[in-house]
Amino acid sequence: MAHGGEMNTSIPCYGIIPARYDSSRFPGKPLADIWGRPMFWHVYAHAKRASVLRNIVLATDDERIAEAALEWEIPCVMTRRDHASGTDRVFEAASKLGVEPHAVIVNIQGDEPALDPAVIEQLVRPFLDGTVQVSTLATPISPERAASPNQVKVVTAANGDALYFSRSRIPFDREGGDGEILGHIGLYAFRMGVTRRYGFPFHFSTRIEFNSNSIPLISTVFHPVKANMES
């Protein structure tokens, strides 16, 4: 992975780590022990190394996670239990923290204990353009990995704009050849003010509208993907 230099920006950026206890596949995952510390501690420690983040907090709906965060001296915000997604939980936490409308919120996945802080800095860089409201990431993947429905792929236009995301194999090549396929990386950043247009909590139709925007793609090892929500 490529590592860029430290990014200097006056944009206020906050990292929020959603941590839900009641996962159907792995209940209590944020508390999973990794080398004597809970998983969320490792996520937080790696995120702290990203120089662009002014503050980082955990957002949870469970007292067990909140108590563990207190024990490890990690800031924590309690949220509702009925959120449909981690993104909704992140925005509730940001609202409770009184984050500025022009500030950038990075939704840091709570199950990425080895997260490279350079990836966060790449994700935030597009917001130096004041029109950018949403950013995410993609990276080239092998045809074998692309064949898995567990890997979300990114469809791009001829000019490199990301058009939509799909679990199906894309792009479809009628000649049977394989072009570069981009796999989506589930890390997002938003301007806080985006909630004023799309409302809170985000509903399924809103997420579809997010994904249907034409999103300029910047070519790096990890591709920051940015969207002008007015487009």
Q: What kind of region is each of these model predictions?
A:
Residues 9-59:
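N-terminal glycine-rich phosphate-binding loop and ensuing alpha1 helix
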Residues 57, 64-108, 112-125:
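Short phosphate-binding loop-to-helix
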Residues 200-204, 210, 222:
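Aromatic (phenylalanine/tyrosine) cluster motif
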Residues 205, 212-214, 219, 228-231:
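Low-acidity, Ser/Thr- and Arg-rich intrinsically disordered low-complexity segments
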